[in-house]
């Protein structure tokens, strides 16, 4: 196979796929999150001993299906950190692009100074399994309990078990926000299905 002559030329692979080869330059390792952001930006609500708060979070990942485990990085400087660590629970709420300005506003304020539910006109609903409130305006709410705090002291990394999930029936694929740094978000795009190419046993395992 002849090597491509420049960045824009497509190379014919042995498997028949024609793919573009990209010419690359050095990139700051501290900024790789722009390409490896883990998922949609979420709003995390918490409550403890009469206090409640909401924080904006972009660093989270699904770790297991059953039980449903989610890992989250929550800075110790965040007002929510102590509320969540002491109560050992929270709610992960999924906003859509309709809430973009609220997502930014929540991230720009501290719960030590304002009640973010009141400040941003958000509706707090009682959860079924935890004391932290749901945010009614969000497309989905996932009630969480702290499952493992072994990495909290060293990495601010919480592992939660989702004990109850509430999801709006439509749209099936909501427009969510994905933070790339420097105040810029990407929006979830069109859906591409390759279901027919998957081995059946893998459809629910990855």
Feature map (PLM): residue ranges:
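A cross-taxon signal for low-complexity, glycine/charged-rich
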Residues: 4-13
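Basic, polyanion-binding surface patches
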Residues: 15-206
């Amino acid at each position: 196979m002849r090597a491509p002559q420049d960045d824009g030329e497509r190379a014919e692979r042995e498997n028949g796929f024609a793919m573009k080869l990209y010419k690359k330059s050095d990139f700051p390792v501290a900024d790789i999150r722009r390409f490896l952001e883990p998922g949609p930006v979420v709003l995390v609500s918490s409550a403890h001993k009469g206090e409640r708060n909401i924080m904006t979070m972009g660093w989270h990942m699904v770790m297991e299906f059953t039980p449903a485990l989610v890992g989250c990085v929550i800075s110790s400087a965040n007002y929510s950190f102590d509320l969540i660590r002491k109560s050992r629970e929270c709610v992960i709420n999924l906003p859509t692009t309709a809430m973009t300005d609220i997502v930014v506003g929540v991230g720009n304020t501290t719960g030590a100074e304002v009640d973010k539910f009141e400040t941003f006109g958000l509706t707090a609903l009682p959860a079924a399994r935890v004391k932290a409130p749901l945010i009614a305006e969000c497309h989905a709410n996932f009630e969480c309990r702290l499952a493992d705090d072994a990495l909290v002291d060293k990495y601010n990394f919480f592992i939660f078990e989702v004990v109850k999930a509430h999801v709006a029936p439509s749209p099936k694929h909501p427009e969510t926000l994905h933070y790339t740094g420097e105040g810029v978000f990407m929006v979830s795009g069109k859906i591409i299905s390759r279901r027919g190419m998957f081995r059946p046993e893998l459809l629910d395992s990855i």
